[in-house]
Amino acid sequence: MLSSLLITQFIYGTISTIIYSLTVVFLTKNWKHFDNYFLKLYICQFFFNMWMYWNFYITSRLPASTCKDCYLSGWFDSLSKDSGSMFPFKFFIFCQYHLGFMSYSNLFLTSINRFTLIFMPKRYFQIWHYGTYILIALIFITPILFTYPLLVHQAYLEYNPLSDTYVARTQADLPFLYSFILVWMVVTVLLSIIANIICWFKISKYSKAARQQSDYRLFLVSFVTFVINCGVFSIAMLNKISADIDPSKLLLSSRIAQLLSPFANDLLSLSTPYVLIIFSKRIRQSIKNLFIKGTVAPSSITPLQNIPASRI
């Protein structure tokens, strides 16, 4: 049972994945011209954003669109609680929650990256030369302190006869995990708000010429991505509140949050390349050349430090 929603999400998800991949290909092929730690974080973010987006199809979207007589029902029945399947379904459940932690951690890390560039430009390269991969490793490892029960306990799919679809279940203590995710989201978002507000006050005093420079444009990329993350966070919080006080979804705000919820995580995972393309004329032109010429000649790219400010 392929719903129109699932088809729509698959189409824009595939298109966004291609565009996201093209930006990464361009940055990788011309790495020496864009040797910037912000862009390294961008490429790292690409991997776990894509992982999170397509992983969600296995844990939620496909099961929620499959009826008892549908093509995938046989596979999903084999993932039931008592089936004894060898398919590592609990690993995909683990990834879904683990990557949720990582998304908000990366939001904070990107905000700190811009903060150090704006307020500590002389020490920026020293800090991120030694700290980039250490911080990325911490983002990846730290959530395991909270998400490891998902790897220990069984996860399975359960058929719901009322909706005629399948639902993912786990024997791990999800309320306990949700409480940690909520605290993690609140703390990282609040710290990101503080960092971005301080940066905004500083950068708003830049001259018109300075606002054409790369650090200003990359700050805008970070800031817009931060605003998008705040929007997704607001939807998540509204869903949590409505689940507690309005489980029947009688209030308009509850219904709006429920309607937006399927697209919120997609916005979190897929918006980054569009923001970068909007604010980077260089990358925008290079993506265009990839479609028209099929490649980007390295000689056509000027090293970042030699690019006129208006062309970055």
Swiss-Prot record:
Sorted UniProt keywords: Membrane, Transmembrane, Transmembrane helix
Segments crossing the lipid bilayer: 6-26, 38-58, 92-112, 132-152, 180-200, 218-238, 259-279
Cited Pfam families: Srg
Main location: membrane
Compartments it resides in: Membrane
Organism of this sequence: Caenorhabditis elegans
GO molecular function, one term: transmembrane signaling receptor activity
Keyword Lipoprotein: no
Family from the record: Belongs to the nematode receptor-like protein srg family.
Protein name as catalogued: Serpentine receptor class gamma-31
Membrane topology: Multi-pass membrane protein
InterPro entries, sorted: 7TM_GPCR_serpentine_rcpt_Srg
GO cellular component labels: membrane
Gene transcribed to yield this protein: srg-31
GO biological process, one term: sensory perception of chemical stimulus
